[in-house]
Design a protein with these regions (language model features):
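Cysteine-nucleophile amide-bond enzymes
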Residues: 22-305
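Bacterial N-terminal signal peptides that target proteins for export
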Residues: 1-10
Length: 305
C-alpha cells in the first residue's frame, strides 16, 4: 500500500511563509526514503532499546510519539502521536495510529509493527521517540478503548486535514484522533461508539482545558494553500483566527502536557539517537537538541556488526 503515515508535520511547515515554497514541492503520498544498510541497522538496534523500555514498564498500553520532518525553526520536535499496544495484532508490541490512505483519499486506523513505526521518519540519521506511561486507572480504560475497533473507529473522522481544528468534527489529523481516543476512554468510558462520539470527546476536551498547539503564520499562506493541497483545510478553523493567521492544531507536545496535568503519576521516557550515539532521558523535560546527553541521562553507543 502506497501510504504516508499522517504528515501533520507538513502542515506545520506550511504555516510559515518562508517554508511554503519548499513544502509545496512535498507530496504526502511520496514513499519515505529507504535508509541505507547502516542506517537500517541503527534503527533496528534503536528499536530494540525502545522495546526494552516498553517491556520494562510492565504496561500494556503506552502513548508513543516520534519525530518527523525537521521542524526546529518552529520549535517542534514531535509530529506524530500513536498508541503502542502489547500483545495486539499478533505482535508483542504494535502501534495503532491514524494514517491517510492515498488510494482511498481518506483517513484509516492502521496497526503497524514497532520497527515500522520507528522507521517512518524523514531523518533516519537522527530521531527521537517519546514514551508516556500511564497510571493504572488511566491505562486500563485507554487500553480497553484502543483495542476495541468499534471505539477506535467511533472517533475516526471521515475527512483528513493535516491542520485540523481540534474542536470541529469536519476534519481530523493523526494526533487529534489519539486525543479524541483519550477523551472517549477517560471522559465517557461507558458510552457507545455512536455518531456522537466525536462531539462528546471534543466537549470533554474543552471542559478539561485541553490546549492545542498554536501556530502563527507570518503571512497568509494557508488561505491559498488550502485551495491547492487536498489534505489542508481552513473551513474548520474559526474565521477570526484564520484572519489573524492563527491555527490551533493537536500536536504530541500538547497531548503530553494534557496527560501530565490530568493523569497523576504518569511518567515519561525520551530516547534519541544521532548516528550510533543513543541518549535515554527520564522525565517531562526534553533531551537537549542534537541528542546531547545531560547529567542523569543514560548513554549507549550502538555496536556494529
Amino acid at each position: 500500500m502506497n501510504r504516508r503515515a499522517c504528515r501533520l508535520a507538513l502542515a506545520a511547515g506550511l504555516l510559515t511563509m518562508s517554508m511554503a515554497a519548499q513544502a509545496l514541492s512535498f507530496e504526502i503520498c511520496d514513499r519515505p526514503k529507504d535508509p541505507g544498510a547502516d542506517q537500517r541497522d541503527v534503527m533496528l538496534r534503536f528499536g530494540a532499546l525502545v522495546r526494552e523500555e516498553l517491556v520494562a514498564s510492565g504496561q500494556d498500553v503506552v502513548l508513543i510519539a516520534r519525530s518527523g520532518l525537521d521542524l526546529r525553526r518552529l520549535d517542534v520536535r514531535y509530529s506524530h502521536e500513536a498508541v503502542a499496544l502489547k500483545d495486539n495484532d499478533d505482535k508483542p508490541w504494535s502501534v495503532r495510529e491514524l494514517y491517510y490512505s492515498c488510494e482511498d483519499h481518506q483517513p484509516r486506523v492502521f496497526d503497524e509493527g514497532l520497527s515500522g513505526f520507528l522507521m517512518g521518519t524523514d531523518d533516519p540519521a537522527t530521531s527521537y521517540i517519546s514514551l508516556v506511561f500511564l497510571p493504572p486507572d488511566r491505562a486500563a480504560p485507554l487500553r480497553a478503548t484502543a483495542v476495541d475497533k468499534h471505539h477506535a473507529l467511533g472517533v475516526l473522522g471521515a475527512s483528513y486535514s493535516a491542520n485540523a481544528y481540534p474542536f470541529s468534527t469536519r476534519h481530523q489529523n493523526c494526533n487529534q484522533w489519539v486525543m479524541e481516543l483519550l477523551a472517549d476512554a477517560w471522559g465517557a468510558p461507558g458510552a457507545g461508539p455512536d455518531a456522537g462520539a466525536r462531539p462528546r470527546a471534543q466537549a470533554w476536551m474543552r471542559a478539561q482545558g485541553y490546549l492545542p498547539t498554536v501556530f502563527t503564520a507570518s503571512a497568509h499562506p494557508m488561505t491559498w494553500l488550502a485551495d491547492l493541497v487536498p489534505w489542508l483545510a481552513n473551513d474548520d478553523h474559526p474565521p477570526d483566527e484564520v484572519a489573524h493567521n492563527r491555527y490551533n492544531v493537536s500536536m504530541p507536545s500538547a497531548i503530553e502536557t494534557f496527560v501530565q496535568a490530568k493523569a497523576a503519576g504518569a511518567t515519561r521516557v525520551e530516547l534519541c539517537h544521532a548516528g550510533r550515539h543513543v541518549v535515554i532521558h527520564a522525565g517531562w523535560t526534553d533531551i537537549a537538541p542534537g541528542c546531547v546527553e545531560q547529567p542523569g541521562d543514560k548513554v549507549i553507543e550502538l555496536e556494529r556488526d
